[in-house]
Design a protein with these regions (language model features):
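GIY-YIG nuclease catalytic motif and its immediate N-terminal context
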Residues: 1-81, 85, 89, 146, ...
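Generic preference for hydrophobic/aromatic residues in regular secondary structure cores
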Residues: 8-10, 99-101, 137
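Charged, glycine/proline-rich intrinsically disordered loops and linkers
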Residues: 30-42, 102-121
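Amphipathic, alpha-helical segments enriched in basic
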Residues: 37-39, 58, 62, 76, ...
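GIY-YIG-like beta-to-alpha core
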Residues: 67-117
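Structure-specific nucleic-acid interaction/processing domains
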Residues: 80, 116-170
Length: 170
């Protein structure tokens, strides 16, 4: 019985489907967008979608690049909305990557909610968010949930983004 309506066997995913998605991501890298394109849009607004030449948000995978270096691989059922959250939101729920990076720059023992109320930490948080805004982002659509989840791990390993990608569960 297929998981999440994925019609491929694991062997086919590993040998054909995921490499094909990676080839599309590699091609998308050539036309990566400035992350600043998403700044000022807290969601996938019509205005933002229009800027991106899209009519609707979409499920898929995205990669932040610092120059030529891949930094982070993410997935979402709503990629444009998720990128907007990373780059605009000021809380650890919606901007979890920014929070994680800021916690590396400003180690602390505080709970997440406490850290977000700490002025020094907030300064570091917004500095990190600004650093993320200076990057470029490439993305591809992946409609099937199982393919999308497997591809996140595949791409993170291929792109060596282990600094910020982790798959450790709670």
């Amino acid at each position: 019985m297929p998981i999440d309506d994925c019609q491929h066997k694991f062997e086919e995913l590993a040998s054909e489907v995921l490499p094909a998605h990676f080839a599309r991501l590699t091609e998308a890298r050539k036309s990566a967008r400035d992350a600043r394109t998403f700044v000022g849009h807290k969601s996938a607004t019509r205005e933002l979608l229009s800027l991106l030449n899209l009519t609707d948000d979409f499920p898929g995978c995205y990669v932040f690049y610092d120059g030529e270096t891949p930094v982070y691989v993410g997935i979402s059922r709503t990629v444009v909305k998720r990128l907007s959250q990373h780059l605009n939101q000021d809380n650890h729920y919606s901007a979890s990557l920014v929070y994680k990076m800021a916690s590396e720059d400003y180690p602390h023992e505080m709970k997440r909610d406490q850290a977000m109320k700490d002025e020094q930490f907030r300064r570091v948080f917004f500095d990190v968010q600004e650093r993320l805004r200076s990057m470029r982002v490439a993305y591809i659509e992946i409609d099937n949930d199982l393919e999308m989840y497997l591809f996140e791990v595949y791409a993170a390993m291929r792109l060596d983004t282990a600094t910020w990608n982790t798959f450790r569960t709670h």
